[in-house]
Amino acid sequence: MMTPIDYENYEYKVGGSLPTDALCYVTRQADQELLTALEVGEFCYVFNSRQMGKSSLRVRTMQLLEAKKVACAAVDVTKLGSKEVTADQWYKGLVVELVRVFKLAGTFDLKAWRNEQTELSAIQQLSLFIEDVLLVKVTNPRICIFLEEIDNVKSLSFSTDDLFALIRACYEQRSHNPIYNRLTFCLLGVATPSDLIVNKQRTPFNIGRSIDLIGFKLAEAKSPLTQGLVVKVDNPVTVLQAILDWTGGQPFLTQKLCKLVIEKAASRDPNIGQLVQQYIVEHWESQDTPPHLRTIRDRIRGSGPR
C-alpha cells in the first residue's frame, strides 16, 4: 500500500521516455537481458515498433551502467540530419556529439585534429577518432554508445552500411587489439537489420544480440502499475488485468488506460471496455493525445512497397 506521500508523487507517464525515478516504470525481462549483455561487452540492438518503451529502457539501462562506472553516451540519430546532409556532414556530426556527450572538448581540439585528417574519408575519421581519441581519453573500464532512432538512417541520401561495418570491425579488432574490449554499442529503433543494410552481402548484425522487447505481463506490471489505482478502484489487480487484456501490454496504451481510470472512471469497479470505447476509439483523432494512433496510420500510409 502506498503512503500518502508516495501517491502524491505517483503519476502514469503517457508518451516519451520515463525519468529514472518514475514509480510507474515496469521492469521487464528485456531490462535484465540488455544490462547483462552490455556489461559483458556484447553488441546489442533493440528493434521494435514505436511506443514500446525503447527510450525508457535505454534511460534506465544507462543509469544502471553508469552506476557501475561504465561511460555511456546516447546519440539521437535524428539530430544528425536527414536528406539534406552529406555523408561527410553526418559522420562529422556524430563525432561532434560523441565529443560533447563524453565531455572531451576540454582535453581535445577537434578542429585541429580534423585539419590533420583531411585526406581521410568521414568514416575513416570516425574510426580513427574511436581508437586514438575516445578509447584513450575516456578512461572508464567500459564505454557504451547508444544510437537511438537508428531507423532514421533510412531517410539519408547515402548508405550508412559503412557505419554498421565499422561497428562490426570494432568487435573483430578485439582479438588483436584488447583496447576494443572496452567498447560496445547498442542500437535502438523501429527497424529490422535488413532494413538498415543496403548491401545485403554485408552482415554486421550477425555478431550482435537482439533484445526482445515485448508487452507488459501482469506479474511484472502488478507492483508498479497498481500503485496508482489503489485509491480509485476496489480491485486494482483485476482492473490492471482488464487493461492488459485490452492493450496486449503495449506500454503507451497501458499507461494511457491506467491514467484514464484515474481521471475518468465513474465507479470503483470501472468498465475498461467502456473507457476504451469512449476515450480512445470514438472520435479517436481528436482524443489521440499524445499522438499514437495517428503515427501508426501515417506510417502505414507512407510505407509503400520497398
Where on the chain are the PLM-derived regions?
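Short regulatory helix/loop adjacent to the ATP-binding pocket of P-loop NTPases
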Residues: N177, A191-G208
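Mid-core helix/loop region of P-loop NTP-binding domains shared across ATPases and GTPases
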Residues: E97, V101-L147, D151-D161, L166-R168, ...
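Conserved catalytic segments around the Walker B and adjacent sensor/switch elements
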Residues: Q63-K83, C144
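A short beta-strand-to-loop transition that corresponds to the Sensor-1 phosphate-sensing loop
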Residues: E149, R182-P193, L257-L260
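Conserved NTP-binding/hydrolysis module of P-loop NTPases
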Residues: C72, E84-F108
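Conserved AAA+ ATPase "SRH/arginine-finger" region at the nucleotide-binding site
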Residues: G208-A219
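Walker A/P-loop-proximal flanking segment of P-loop NTPase domains
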Residues: M2-L65, D132-V136, G228
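Winged-helix-like regulatory helical subdomains adjacent to P-loop NTPase cores
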Residues: T3, A219-K222, T226-R306
